[in-house]
Amino acid sequence: MKKLTFGTPEALVPSVFCDGFQYTERPIHYAVDRIRFKTTARGCRLEFPMQPGEQIFGLGLQLKIFNLTHRQMVTRVNSDPISATGDSHAPVPFFVSTAGYGIYFDTARYVEFDFGRPRAGRPSQYEGEREIAVSTETLYAQRELAGEVTIAANIPAARGVDIYIIEGETITDIVSQYNMLSGGGCSVPEWGLTPFYRCCSRYSQEQILETAKYLREHDMPVGILGLEPGWQTRA
């Protein structure tokens, strides 16, 4: 793990308010000399190299999307996200890559990410995009951008930022290091990590128990069962 400072970071950032913030520097293999940084009238911008076939995941709780590759995302707080734009109850400016690294941006600003952008001046073209899809596999295959592409991060109003580059053999290892960096945390019960299911708010106790029985008999890994709350009808 390595901390890199670009420009003049802001004073009020998440790490300042994290009593258990644990940064331990270790050598990394990431090509930091290929990171590009600049400030503009709008804020600051960083660009990171991206390898062919590299896949990106993360940005905290994301309800509408899992794989962020070739997507534009904004880590914006929103209690009712309706599309896969990065809006979330709990967005985090941290992503992980299948190339063996993750990057945390120590900023409280909304960060605008572009995961797979052609270098400036290069056309946005996909490998084999002239080929006609004639099967399900080719139609839904992960497309790769032709030429050199980057990961871009724009931070409006900021004149700089600290980033933490974390490396590991697996995504789990990278996320574990991020968890320790951000202060660790208590272990949650196993059922708390399972899917939840909400029954109709008018269900009786017998109907709820029957639903629970059905889920178990069909090996559905639901660990939390509840009722639809009615959504503020009598708040």
How does the language model describe each region?
Residues E47, P221-A235:
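Aromatic- and carboxylate-enriched substrate-binding clefts and catalytic-loop regions
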